[in-house]
Amino acid sequence: MVDIDKDNLPNIIDGNVPKNYELCKEGDIVFADASEDTNEVAKAVEYYNLNGKKVVCGLHTIHGRDNKNKTVVGYKGYAFSSMSFHHQIRRIAQGTKIYSINSKNFSKCYVGIPSKDEQQKIADLLRLIDERIATQNKIIEDLKKLKCAI
């Protein structure tokens, strides 16, 4: 998940949106369309907290949007990062040195979509776990620095 308030991304100057690119909206998801590693093909990132900032998908990405409003913001990033989704992607990724997918391949994949209430609970729980992991990693890094200083 990319929180535009916390994560530093390159900026688009007003009026300079690249041609053939659509601006991302809150909850849009971006997939990597190629990688040297099958674990990284279709790696997903969901955008949230855009707060009016202009964001476009970069090269070698597939831009996804929930046009039918079946998901809550925050759920898709976790759903498309699941092992069950990536097992499906590994079967359909093409290539020998560089593995790739295209938007047509996604029609062969399935992701479970529970009720919106359940999605929100799942997303909130996983976000709290991510925050806890980040906090623990920071503590570990600080302790390593302290150990080296002693």
Where are these regions (language model features)?
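Flexible, active-site-proximal loop/turn residues at the rims of small-molecule/cofactor binding pockets
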Residues: 36, 68, 115
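Short, solvent-exposed loop/turn positions at domain surfaces
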Residues: 15-18, 95, 127
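Amphipathic alpha-helical segments
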Residues: 76, 107-149
